[in-house]
Structure formats: structure tokens, C-alpha cells
Amino acid sequence: MKLTKYLILSAALVLAAGCAEQKKASTIGADANLEARVERLLSKMTLAEKIGQMNQVSAGGDVSQYADAIRNGQVGSILNEVDPVKINEFQRLSVEETRLGIPLLVGRDVIHGFHTVFPIPLGLAATFDPALVEEGARIAAIEATAQGVRWTFSPMLDIARDPRWGRIAEGSGEDTYLDARMAEAMVYGYQGREADTTSMAACVKHFVGYGAAEGGRDYNSTFLTERQLRNFYLPPFEAAIKAGAMTLMTSFNDNDGVPSTGNTFVVKDILRGEWGFDGLVVTDWNSMGEMINHGFGEDRMDVAEKAANAGVDMDMMTFGFLSHLEELVKEGAVKEKTIDNAVRNILRVKFMLGLFEHPYVDVEAAKAVQYTPEHLAAARRTAEESAILLKNNGILPLKGKGCILVTDPMADAPWDQLGTWCFDGEKEHTVTPLKALQERFPGQVTYVPGLRYSREKRERFDDVVAAARGADVVLAFLGEEAILSGEAHCLADLNLIGSQSELLAALKSTGKPVVATILAGRPLTIERDLPNCDAVLYSFHPGTMGGPALANLLSGEVNPSGKTPITFLRTVGQAPLYYNHNMTGRPYQGETLLADIEPEAGQTSLGNTSYYLDYGAYPLFPFGYGLSYTNFEYSNLSLDKEEYSSYETIAVTFTLANTGDYKGTEVAQVYVRDLVGSLTRPVKELKCFERVELAPGESRNITLQIPVQDLAFWGLDGIRKVEPGQFQLWVAGDSASGEPVSFSVR
């Protein structure tokens, strides 16, 4: 996908830019044509200068560490520096003390907010609200670019079906369609619908299949076929590229034996060849060097050659390009035109961001855009929409003036509340649930710490249980610390860690109603805890304003509307379990569980169907699930036609009614099943969703449009197309509900 949407802006920046900030950059010329500017600069560069642009270094700390390398034209990008004073100095070195004055591209992991931290991406996906997610990404870009960060290594688009994998927190869950919609939203948010000096280049990652790591262990191998890649794992990346994503990152994993950073098929053939991507491709941290560990290359020279010829433009922290590309070009192992094309892609991004015209930032002005009331309000709204009500026996919303006991370990954990992969959030600005509840219910809240952190043992249980006996309701804030999810933080046991389940049981033994609010980076296995809870509100680490959001939800000021973006397992032994699995030859038709088997039973296949003897076939909560304080009813589902051609659009009409007592928002979800195909097809696939707000007693007729082309898949013949035949379609509040209607495609 050609990066043309920012061309007009490039011209505008050139015309508007003053000379004070440019100095040597002004020698490049003020040509409004982006490609002409790129070619003009490229033609002036020596081979060594070109290779320098392909080198990225981690420059956090002392500016002098890389000052000489920058002066010598050996650095094209830095990461891990957010101090605007230092960034300005790095830029000054590059713009004013190098021959061509090419500015640096400054990168940072701005994953779910910069200073104002939003819910982790798995929580963002739980909103099913792309517009709100785009707003959050726009705020992150405004805050980060004000300090000189013009490139974020986000969004992560790895489909993840195994909650043991720590980085499940950083993505949008298990569904391809939802992931694609979130990808588009974050790209639009980071880069802006129209580029300006607050545009921060998005970097979609990790290309590709990283989330399918075998056994849920980070960095592990993946074994995905081409059809699996094309039907499930690649579409979110393609959607992000079509939305204008400027950059892409390769992944750590090897798929079917080929490490991503040296995978010509996915990078050069699909990304570059089929999709026409002319943006910047960067390695993940030392993933070029790690190809040596994979056994895919002998040394840094070998893997540098493989990465360059696969279509990688920039090396993050291996220094393989810097050390060996010039020699590889002389030997003919890498063509100079390959280097030229890589540098074109790098320069193109720098021009599109306006870095040649605006390499510096206003240090004082940067402070004014952090933690603004508008940003904090958006973070609160997002945290509200991301929370999922999993159980409610009528105890929520909180009523009356009674005594509320609040207990740990997540009630007053300002750092852990921010979630994983959060480098610039500050716990001093975090509003915790305890603080927010004390403000919401003045004089009613008693706080008794039970566990200081999620892994602590039960030394203080007696104090908490005694306090519970005197309370009218117990609010237990449970979950996992931020450090327990994220990169390299995988778990084999997904139960509430430490003594938290024991704490819940002890609280329930008092006979008082217990509300569990769980803050975590993944879907934990909480089946054993449900009997000890009268209500469960699940919040994937909610960020800076998680406290006010949860207080609003628990009090009924806001009605929960979040939906599960990932299947919640009954036990870790079910992993991976996901809703859009293929139909088997022996689909589920009932089960015989362990308790049903007689002693010395004769050998039998116990029903000839697909399930576990101890845990059955179904998850604890399916994809798309989430309760409300009100009730929603679906009716009158119909389609505008019974048969469609492959280029028509299906009009799906249904009635949604709020039959309860509270105003609420329902996420109406449309699922489709292809009954017969040239390949076995998923039992259901999400094809559309819509957030609908209804007042008590209100009903609304809703029509959603689904292009028939959205039913296409990559088949045996290596072509993506819609196959004619019979289909079923559901509209429901989750992936396991509703009655289908039928249609056909000719």
C-alpha cells in the first residue's frame, strides 16, 4: 500500500517551515513531491551514509554515548529516550553536525498511552469501540510527539489464542476481524487522519505469527501453514497497511523453521510484493542477531545478508547492517539497489513526518499537553467501556448507605494498575479504586489490607475477615501485578496467584456479599472462585484512571458494556480454546464426564464427540461475552435477500430492546458460518459489530451491512475468493448465543 496520504502535508510543511530550525536540512530543497525529495537526497548519499540510516540504537541516558556515531552518519534512528532536552540535542547533532543534516527518527514503546495511560490493548479490544480506541491513540501521539517521540512500536496485531502467553496483554485477542478494526483505529489515532507535527508513525508488529508461540511460551517456534497465515494472522496487518501504517516490525519467532527477520516469503513476497508496502520495516530488538541462536545463520555478517535480502530496512540493536553491509555490497551478496530501496523507505517516513522541517520540539510546551483534563477524561471513559461484568447476583450496582469493606491486593496498587509495557506512566498520577471509592462514598469505605501484592501469603487474613463481618458488602480487588504479564512473562498456571482464592473463600464464609473486581493482563481461570463471588467485574489493567472508572461502574453511575475479546478458560488444560475453530468430523453432541463413568466401565469411546472428560467442551465465558445491569433482547432477525452474488452487500436487520431498568449499551455482534467449503471452515466468524445505547424500555430496529466479499477466504487453489454455497448468520450478544438465519451465495 503506497504511503501517499501524507503527500499534501509534506508540501504544506515545506512551504510553512521557517529557516531557523532547518540549517543544513534546507539544502535538500523544498520540492513538494515526496518521491522527488527522497531521490534527491538519496543521490547525494555515500554508501556508508546510506547504511548509517539503517542503524537504530538505544540511546537512553548520556547523549555523549552515541554523539560521535551520529556525527559520523552511523545512526538513522534512536529509541528509549523521551527527555525532550536530550532529544533536541540528539537532533542537533544529526541535523547540524552531519554532512547532509538528516534528522533522526525517535522511537519508543508507546503501547497504551504515553504519560496518560489507557487500558492495556486487550482491554481496549474489550470496548469493541474503534472510535474510542482511535481517540486514545491520538492522545498518546499528542503527548509523545510533544517530547520528540515520532515513532511508536505499536499496535501489536498478533492473534493470540493461548492466555499462557504473556504478550496476550499487548494485543486484541483471538479474533481476526476485531483485531483488524482495532489495528485501523490505532493507526489512524497515532498518525492522525491528516498528518501534522503530532503525527507519530505507527509500527505494526510482530510480522508474523508470533502470538501462536508453541505452548504459550514467548519466543517459541510457530508452525502455521500459509492458509492459516492468510486466513487468520495476516488480515489485521493488511488492514493496518491499508489504513496507512508507515512502519512494520518483524518478530522473534521462526515459523516452520524460518525466522521472521530473514523470511523472504512474508516480508518480500507478501508485504512488499502483494501489498505494495513501501514503508519502513524494522527488526525487533536484536532479532537479526538472534537468527544466529536459531541456527539460521553463522555470524552477524550472514544474518545481516539474510535480513537485507528479505526486505528489512532497519536493524534494531544488532549492529549487523552497520558492521557488514558495506562488505556484503562489495562482495555482491547484497546489491546496492537493495540498500537504496531500504534507505528510500526510511527517508520517506522522515519526510512524511515533517522531520526535516521540524526536527526540534518546544520543551516548555511539551509539559502543557501531559495529563490534561481532556486526556484523563478519555482514559476514564475507555477504562469504563473496557470493564466486563462476568457475574452479578443482583448485588451490583451498589445500593444504599451501608458500610463498604475494600481489600487488596489491587485496590491501591497504582503502579500495577497501569499494566504491562508501560514505560512513561507515573504512579503518582494514577487514581486507584480505593481513592476513587473513598471519594464516591465518603464515610462509608473501610480499607483493610489483606495482601500487599498478588503473590503474598495470608498473614493478614484474620483482620480482613473480622472487618468483613462488620461490613454490608465486601469489594475485593484481585488479579495480577503488571510484571506478571507482557513480554517474556508467561504462566503455566492461570489461577489467581498466591493466596487470593483463599482470601475470597474466607470473605465468603462471613455470609456477606462479595464483589470481586479483577485487574489482570490476561483472562485468568477463575471458575473455582465464582461460587465465592456474588459479582465479578473484570478489568484488564485499566491505566491511569482505572480507579474512577471502576468506582463509576460499581456504583451504577456507568453501566458495564465491555465484552470478552478472548475466550475465558475453565482450566489452563483447555488452551488453546477459541470460538472460531473449525468443525470436526465428530462435533460436540453431549458429554460423559468423569462422575458419570461407572467403576470398571467397559472400554468405550463415550459418545464419539470432541470434549474433555473432566471439563467438557465449553469455556467458562465465550468470546464476545459481557453482562449489563439491564437486559437486552434480540428479535426479528432478517436479511434483505435469500441469495447474493459475490459482490453484493448483505443487509442484516434486527430489533434490539432494552427490557431492564437501566440505560445501557449492548455490543450487537454478527457471526457467519460457511456450511460447506473447499476447506473445513470455522463454526462461526465475527463479521460485524455495533455498539447500541438504549434507554430502559427502548427498542430499535437496526440494519448492518456486510459485503459478501468479507466472506472470502484463501482456499486450496491459493486464491482468496467467496465460494458459492449455503451460509448461516447470527446476531447476538456473544459468540455462543442466538438463532441463525440462512442465505446463499451464487
Question: Which residue stretches match the model-derived regions?
Answer:
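Glycoside hydrolase catalytic-domain context in secreted enzymes
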Residues: 18-714, 721-735, 742-746
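Bacterial Sec-dependent N-terminal signal peptides
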Residues: 1-27
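Short glycine/proline-enriched turn or capping motifs at secondary-structure junctions
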Residues: 6, 736-739
